[in-house]
Structures are given as C-alpha cells and as structure tokens.
Amino acid sequence: MDSDFGIPRELSPLQQLRSQYHPELPPCLQGTTVRVELGDGTTVAKAGDAHIIARAFPHTLGQPLAHFLRATAKVADAQIITEHPVKRVGIVFCGRQAPGGHNVVWGLYEALKVHNAKNTLLGFLGGSEGLFAQKTLEITDEVLQTYKNQGGYDMLGRTKDQIRTTEQVNAALKACTDLKLDSLVIIGGVTSNTDAAHLAEFFAEAKCSTKVVGVPVTINGDLKNQFVEANVGFDTTCKVNSQLISNICTDALSAEKYYYFVRLMGRKHSHVALECTLQSHPNMVILGEEVTASKLTIFDIIKQICDAVQARAEQDKNHGVILIPEGLVESIPELYALLKEIHGLLKEGVQVDNISTQLSSWSSALFEFLPPFIKKQLLLHPESDDSAQLSQIETEKLLAYLVETEMNKRLKEGTYKGKKFNAICHFFGYQARGSLPSKFDCDYAYVLGHVCYHILAAGLNGYMATVTNLKSPVNKWKCGAAPISAMMTVKRWSQNSGSTTIGRPVIHPASVDLKGKAYDLLRQNAQKFLMEDMYRNPGPVQYDGPGADAKAVSLCVEDQDYMGKIKKLQEYLDQVRTIVKPGCSQDVLKAALSVMASVTDVLTTISSSSTSGQQFA
C-alpha cells in the first residue's frame, strides 16, 4: 500500500461534525431486500448512429433499463434478489476530483457489508495507473472513518489518464482477473464512463466474469442525458463558486471602479457558468454555447463587453462582474481553428519554438495579434485525451486585455466618457473541487454507491448507476441503472475532400440547452442583471438549517424525469394490452387502431427529424 493514501486525516471541528452525518437512503434501497425490474431493451439516441454503435458493442448494446424497487412493490415482473454470495469488488477514481466522490465508496462499502459481511471492496491507488499496476487498498471502517462526507480524492488518489489503448485495456483485464474481481466500479465523467462502457464490452468479449459499472461524478455537469439528471460534485462546485462570485460582486459595488473577469472551471461547456449566474446574478456571462450558435468572433465578444461597459458608464456605473467558462476559447471559431492547427503540428513532432513558422497564413496572423502570455499557453501540449489544457489558458486575461485596449481607444476618440477602465482577473476551480461536499452531493453520492451494489448483485455489465427525480426530497428519489452504450453518440467530421470521417462511439459531453428552462430563465433576467446590479449572495455552503437542502437552480427548473416517464408510458401500454384483447368490441378495436396509427406516424416523423440532425464537428 502507498503510505500517502488511506491514512487517517486530521479533521477540523467542522470536518468532524460532517463525518458524523449519515446520508439518507430512498425507500427503494432501505433494508436488505430490493426488487429489480428489467424493462424494455434500450436503443441509441440517434438512429443514424445505431449500426456504428452496434458494431462496437455487440454484447452490451440493447440491454434493458433496470429499476430498483422496495420489497413490497407490487410489480409483476420485478424479481427479489435472494442470493448474495461473497463478492470481491474493485473501485477506482478516474478523472478530476469532485466533491462527494468518497461517499460513493462509502455507500458501496456499506451495501456490500450489509448483504454479506464477507464481501471485500478494494480501492485502486492512484487511479487507473493503480488499476494497471494492481496497487490496492482494502476499504475498511477504519479507512473510511475520516473520509466520510469529505472532499477530494485523497483516500485513494486519482488519475486523468484513459483506459483506452490495447496495453491499458489488457492491463485492466489482467488486474481484474488476477484479483478475482466480480465487479469494477469506475468513478468519473464523460471520458471515464466512455472507457467503462468499452471496457465492459471488452470483458464480455474476453469472457471475463468481472462486471463494469460507471458512476457519474464530475464538477463539469456535462454528463447529462435522458438517463442522468445531475453529476456528483456539480452542486458543491457551483455553490462554492457562487459564494466567491457574490463576494466579488459586493466588492465591485463597494469600490465602484473595477471590472472583474472571472473564469470558471468546467471544461468545454458552460453548465457551471450558467448555474453560478443563476445563483449570484453577476452583470454578464459569456456562454460558449451562445458564441457557437451565433458564430461570434473574439472581436464580436469584445464589442459586446465594451458596449455594456459604456452603457453602464452612462448610468455612472464604472464597475461590474463578468463570468467566463474555461471552454470559451474552444467556442470562438478562429481561436479554436488556431488551437487545432497548433495541436496538429505538435502531434507531427514540430518543436514548440518552430510552431509559429509552420502555421497557415491566416492562423499566423491571428497568432501574432495575440499577447505573448496567451501565445505561450496556446502552445501547451494537449491533455492525454487530446483536449486542450483549458485550465491553463487564461481567457479572462485575454478578454480583459482586449477590452481595456478598446476602451482606451474609445476614451481617446471621445466616444466613451466614463472613468478609465480597470480590470481584475480571477480563475475559480481548484477552490471548489476539493471543498467539503454539500448535503445534496453527500446524499447523492452515497445513494449511487448503494445502487452500484444492486447493479452487480443483478449481474449487470456495462451499466451506469442512476438516480432520478433529484429535485425532490431523498424519500422520493428513484433508483435504477442504464446501459452506458445507450448514451453513446458518434461524431462526423466533414473533410476538405468532401469525405466524412466517423469517430468512435463515446458519451459526448452535453452542452447547455439553449431551448431549456434554465437558459430561458437567464435570458429573462439578463438585461436586469447587466444594468441594475441585482447581485445575490447565497453565502457559504450550508450543512444544516435554512439553505442546507437548496439544490442547483438548473436542476430544479428542468423537467428531467425521463426514466419515470418511460415507466409511465409502459403503464399506459400495459393498460392498452389489458383493454384490447381478443374478444373486445369492434368499437374498442377500431379506436385503438386509429389512435395507434396516428401516434406511430407522429413518432416516426419526430424520430426521422432527430436522425437527420447528426453531429458534425
């Protein structure tokens, strides 16, 4: 065992108090007897991707949804799992840390021990590298004692490397075989759960008995689809960020002479930025999805900000707070094109010092226009998954620099008559992702850990643990599991030659829905936020009393219970089968045929339109 992992922490009084909190379980998971109902087989979201995904997942595509129900539930096809033989389970943190991750381990450990005291849970030390090297720590009550309801991943450590290459996949197979694991639980975001799906398929093909289960844990909030409502860590991250942002808003209003540019960690998409805006009400937020949809250039964005600064100055307001998602650089078309060209040259082995001379004329002109600090950051080698090192690219400083340049120009020309523009820049991310998890994240992660046990007890492979109806109290949460392959989509790239390159099936990160209720709420208030300084301070994360049960605004305003609606549809179909049987009247039969024909026509049309909208990059 690595002595750096699993050692008892020294806890502050608040940490000690939090370690004593025991999360609640929804009724369906209480007790030792749980029913599992396997529904209809799943399909993929885009019909046009089906044949590609089917080739990649011959063993794990089309598996049914699983619903976990209380023992007393009267569902004809739901089975009670009565046998609980001894299990050996491995668990690994993949990807970046998110508040609440430790509670997934705790929940799984408790479920294992409740159902059979001889069960064993092994934590892999150092993430996927520990998996490949078979470095493990047996999870015990003593190990867990100072990590319950605590932030970080320091109990086991983590890695951001994938489980993707032939060598890595074979190492994972060997580890699970050598350690005689019945199940491997992978904790992470879109990339880690994509790897979990491919690993589950590889294990099935290799006739390995180890079942692979994924858990949606990421601060980015971008592992969202019809099965997954929220990610562990997102709630805490947004609450911590929102407190910091609101403190800055108060400072801006007090001094009345600074514009704060705040970049927020969250990868390519803007879920964190949107949620923090809804919680703290800064003056502006630049969402990457808006930039992409409107094809805004860097100069369009600068003009938007400068016009806002000028309009506020006309009301004698020379201060403000502007939020920027860290992925904005990948949403600005000319910067993204430059970044891809640089990454292509780095991949070809071109030395960093020679990159600027190898760029196309258009990219070279843009590169030379940029300030030196941004040039240096754009030249950084990409991450192990080929994505840009977004946390290292100081987009907020680039925007502040260009806005200041433009405002000085306007001041000199006499078109701007306000005070001299002063900018202060911040980057929030690391401050939040190691925070003590919120009550919601503690509960959610702990419940997901329990769900993982029931997935493996049901013998399911290639599934993700899911909990729905999350905006309601815990006693109304619905627990289940969905095949990860059903969450896959395929991207297509149009080449200059007119041909199309097709990517591998993956879980693509969800973008902010510009037709969704959360975004609509922002748009309704954007002008007031901009001009009226409606700053809101939610305060620190609350663990008890008023505010402790508060949840993300974006979670509460959306209507997301997809799996609940699937069950409701199944109930309607069952009722139709009960009513329309041989021997029913002609009138009943005619009405059923007419209605079903109309419904089928409508669904076929909708399905065809969604298929034609394939993802191109």
UniProtKB/Swiss-Prot annotation:
GO function term, MF aspect, one: ATP binding
Subcellular location field: Cytoplasm
Highest taxon of source: Eukaryota
Tissue-specific expression: Expressed in roots and specific parts such as the trichomes of leaves, cotyledon veins, as well as in stamen and gynoecium of flowers.
Gene3D superfamilies tied to this protein: 3.40.50.450, Phosphofructokinase domain (3.40.50.460), Phosphofructokinase, domain 3 (1.10.10.480)
Pathway annotation from the record: Carbohydrate degradation; glycolysis; D-glyceraldehyde 3-phosphate and glycerone phosphate from D-glucose: step 3/4
Any one Gene Ontology BP term: photosynthesis
Regulation: Allosterically activated by fructose 2,6-bisphosphate.
Keyword terms, alphabetized: Allosteric enzyme, Cytoplasm, Glycolysis, Kinase, Magnesium, Metal-binding, Transferase
GO (cellular component) term, any one: mitochondrion
Xref: InterPro entries: PfpB_PPi_PFK (IPR011183), Phosphofructokinase_dom (IPR000023), PKF_sf (IPR035966)
Functional note: Regulatory subunit of pyrophosphate--fructose 6-phosphate 1-phosphotransferase.
Homology family: Belongs to the phosphofructokinase type A (PFKA) family. PPi-dependent PFK group II subfamily. Clade 'Long' sub-subfamily.
Assembly and binders: Tetramer of two alpha (regulatory) and two beta (catalytic) chains.
Protein known as: Pyrophosphate--fructose 6-phosphate 1-phosphotransferase subunit alpha 2
Lineage: Eukaryota, Viridiplantae, Streptophyta, Embryophyta, Tracheophyta
Gene: PFP-ALPHA2
